[in-house]
Amino acid sequence: MKLSHMLLSLASLGVATALPRTPNHNAATTAFPSTSGLHFTIDGKTGYFAGTNSYWIGFLTNNDDVDLVMSQLAASDLKILRVWGFNDVNTKPTDGTVWYQLHANGTSTINTGADGLQRLDYVVTSAEKYGVKLIINFVNEWTDYGGMQAYVTAYGAAAQTDFYTNTAIQAAYKNYIKAVVSRYSSSAAIFAWELANEPRCQGCDTSVLYNWISDTSKYIKSLDSKHLVTIGDEGFGLDVDSDGSYPYTYGEGLNFTKNLGISTIDFGTLHLYPDSWGTSYDWGNGWITAHAAACKAVGKPCLLEEYGVTSNHCAVESPWQQTAGNATGISGDLYWQYGTTFSWGQSPNDGNTFYYNTSDFTCLVTDHVAAINAQSK
């Protein structure tokens, strides 16, 4: 998801005690999530799973706030939470704002301090405690929280698309991947490592992203062969049941089926935003089933990883959930995005957010999870 602006000021949320990362050996299970044919397996159960997104949880500065979210997810039986594993800056903040990596003058500095990766440490620790599984990505296509452009700016590349091929940038990117993966490679709370949030390479030959995906996923597997790896793309570039609309074309440099066939990619992802893409809401059902068919053909499960609208959440998104749940090849969905109320106020609302214990939450979480559980019996 591309955010329209910075939605969360974290300097004012209090300061938490941040300790060096240590695994929580009291986690609900030590079994790592995996795939089984066209399905996911979590905690020994193979099937379809519901979840959500929270880009902001790793930027909270109060541990109690993180625990509140995780406890609500666990109580709601939302098994998977996708979080931002990046927070790139070109200038070091001085106001207490959380940041993970500084890019400046051709160098990159990883922040492992209390206002850096120790905040992500606590997200993993809390996820272990509450039995939630995390998808952690490493960089953003968009400029929110720095993104690829932060690298491009610091290393003097000509265009954002150079991120994928610039040797110095890729070395810094891989160094960050190594830093994050090495912190959590022993944690059963990790569902998957994700190359990026919505990677695109507009106007590029599809070989550019294919080669980058192949190389990066192979590198991640060399660091951690036990966890799943995925791309984090929107599902663009698909010739299965194509209606010729832009998302099906290769204009963003992606070939969904070919990329999914890479041996070091364990499952596929797709996103769904008709309001942003200029398509109808009903169009989304075909988008889901087309990807399900592609996933089935490749023999790997796919995850409807992001989907959202700004109004009429239940009426619009519930049919998508039903379509995904009934489609062979799709094994889970994560709505965008989770919302809750803290002691200091509500979590960010980018327009797609709906909040815990509201009528939309009942429709799209409580009822949805109940339907999944009923179907799996």
UniProtKB/Swiss-Prot annotation:
Substrate binds at residues 84, 197, 273, 336. It comes from Aspergillus aculeatus. The active site is at residues 198, 306. GO terms for molecular function: mannan endo-1,4-beta-mannosidase activity. The keyword Glycoprotein applies. Residues 1-18 form the signal peptide. GO terms for cellular component: extracellular region. Its main location: secreted. Its EC number is 3.2.1.78. Keywords: Carbohydrate metabolism, Glycoprotein, Glycosidase, Hydrolase, Secreted, Signal. Optimum temperature is between 60 and 70 degrees Celsius. It catalyses: Random hydrolysis of (1->4)-beta-D-mannosidic linkages in mannans, galactomannans and glucomannans. Endo-1,4-mannanase, a crucial enzyme for depolymerization of seed galactomannans and wood galactoglucomannans. Belongs to the glycosyl hydrolase 5 (cellulase A) family. It is found in: Secreted. Optimum pH is 5.0. Glycans are attached at residues 105, 255, 326, 357. The keyword Glycoprotein applies. This is Mannan endo-1,4-beta-mannosidase A. One of its GO terms (biological process) is mannan catabolic process. It comes from the Eukaryota.
